[in-house]
Amino acid sequence: MVNKFLAGRLKKSKGKSFKGSSSKGNSKTVKSNNNDNVVVNAADLKWKPVEIPDTLDDFEGFYGLEEIDGVGVKIVGGQVQFVAHDDTKINGNEDNLDSKDKIEIDEDAPENDLVEFKNMDDMKDGELTDNSQSESEAEAESEAESEEEEEKTGDDEGEDGAEKVDNEVLKTNVFNTDIDLEDITPSDLPEWTEKVGELSFTTLHGLTKLGFNKPTLIQEEAIPMALKGEDIMGKASTGSGKTLAYGIPIIEKLMKSKSNTAPIGLIFTPTRELAKQVTDHLRKIASLIVDKSPHAILSLTGGLSIQKQERLLKYEGSGRIVVATPGRFLELIEKDKTLVERFSQISTLVLDEADRLLQDGHFDEFENILKYLGRESKNRKHNWQTMIFSATFATDLFDKLSHASWKNMKTPSKNENEMEIVLKHLMTKIHFKSKPILIDANPEDKVSSQIKESLIECAATERDLFCYYFVSMYPGKTLIFCNAIDSVKKLTAYLNNLNISCFQIHSSMTQKNRLRNLERYQQQSEKNKILGKPTVLVGSDVAARGLDIPGIQHVIHYHLPRTADVYIHRSGRTARANNEGVSVMICSPEEAMGPLRKLRKTLANKSGKDIIMGKKKWQKTVTMLPIDDTILSQLKERSRLASELADHDLASSSLQKDDTWMKKAAEDLGVDIDSDDEIKDTFLAKNINKKRNKTLGKDQKKVLVAQLNDLLKRPLRKDMRQRYLTGGLVNLADSLVKKRGHDHIIGHEKTDALETLKNKKRK
């Protein structure tokens, strides 16, 4: 037995494994005298493959090494025994420890039954052959049995008929460090290959994994041209798949590249959140590449450690596809001139949400980047492909809605090509290797046809109330946009006081806090979806462009946006990927007089469908959202109390910060500061007095909190007749017993904002 085990071990070491081996027919599990321990043969243990790091190259010729823990080794009478301390270490013996294969140890067995161990050098000629005949037969039987098991379990990938023994020895996951065969399924996407062309297995695998079974219109038109190396200027509505329209051609170039380090694509986005989103999207599509080279696709944005980004760029094979914001990328290449030489060799340059380049003040950093890279590429006589994508390419969209009169605006001309005008403007700033191909996936509609627009008219001081009404009446995932950061903070505190899950995101927050709030918003929305409660994200226009937050049902414009392009991008956060959504404008009388009319005329369909029989239909293209006055009246007192508490919290926090800042500044300067000095400054005095007037005393705050909590405990009712549940037009008792109707408003039917607007249009 000892000789057999050692010979088997020697053979396996020469072959590919670390453990000992014996035939399955003769390997027997043995129950020891100790009830807690089981003596087993080496072949019956659950050996685990040893992962070989890439840094160790060929690991001195060793392959197929296996290990096991929780198993002891004993030498009894010169015989090696493996002792398993628990049953889980034994193959298939967890529930069959008392089977007929187990025998009791006979410690008094005659020593003649044991095979004497001899050194290989001491053996006579022919002795090894004679002694190993039975062993060879047993091993042959073992290999046959194991091959049958492989056929049953389906683990026969890579098996070759001529080398069955070698493949049996190498049945560890030695080569799985590069690719996991179990995760790869055959990709059959006929619509992609027919409409777009031949794509690599990596791309098809990523599309299959994400469930993208067919290309969108912009992808269908842009990808074939991009694969040919043409410069492209693409326009498509929000949520139409523009990221993959330029992402897939870049990944295809990466797959065809002969170099393992040369940069392929450089993608610029206007916001950090959009850069992270694009990076995550590309990493999912190219998951097979990322598994092998984790840093091949990198995001370089501000708000995060620049030292870490510099370190990542130094890894071999890193940064082959870079998604960046212009500010951070410019900072990196100015610090390290070798990066200029490196990224001047890119094959493709992409500008996502490129309409921002038309606005003054947004192009300076990007223009400097183009100068650095362009100068170096010119020396190398190298030209890159340029692709520009956005949802809006019209110069009139960037005019301030509050400035010019809507009456002086020109009606859009049918013969005037907006993209041609924009292209002439861009060609003065960006160097194209040839005239770009213009692709317009939605030439008529500026706002996606999947978005149902609506309007709420109210006083300027009632915006909070109508936001509360909307999220109470139509629970779901809602995104509210404000023009000012102070409004974002106030509305967030206001809704939280009303026990509504609310999160905020704005430019004053650090990048980590923004991303953390987005994650928390997603997690909370999943919980509230089950409970039928609303989840709200309040943001400034930093969240308006490109962010793909799954499942946004409603977008509310707390303030009318300053420009029409911002309205288009805000509304585009809903109705993504062929879904429908609702966009609601809360408009004061002052806004309705000029900015609203100008917005509607700017967004008018240039095909002429909005002008019927001389009437300007564009003035009445927005549906008024129905308001239930009985519900609204019950919310007014709650809204007032929550608003006062929110004002108090913000004013107190602001006063405390101001006081801390003044004291710290005085301490740094070594100056004594007196409260009377603050009053001498007229501006500071007015600001401080304004904040102090909004603060409450401790007792006063407690009273307001108690009153608000008392009101929040009372359920909202559609019918205010509370004496008899069965009275009135609605049988409240029946609705309560059968659990029908609205989750939080007794007597009200379960409503959906999208269906409400659709039904109103039909009427």
From Swiss-Prot:
Record Pfam families = DEAD, Helicase_C
GO BP terms in the entry: maturation of 5.8S rRNA from tricistronic rRNA transcript (SSU-rRNA, 5.8S rRNA, LSU-rRNA); maturation of LSU-rRNA from tricistronic rRNA transcript (SSU-rRNA, 5.8S rRNA, LSU-rRNA)
Highest taxon above the source species: Eukaryota
Q: What InterPro entries does the record tag this protein with?
A: DEAD/DEAH_box_helicase_dom, DEAD_box_RNA_helicase, Helicase_ATP-bd, Helicase_C-like, P-loop_NTPase, RNA-helicase_DEAD-box_CS
Q: Where is the composition biased (Basic and acidic residues)?
A: 115-127
Q: Please give the SUPFAM superfamilies that the UniProt record associates with this protein.
A: P-loop containing nucleoside triphosphate hydrolases
Q: Which residues form the Helicase C-terminal domain?
A: 450-619
Put simply, this protein is called: ATP-dependent RNA helicase MAK5
Name of the encoding gene: MAK5
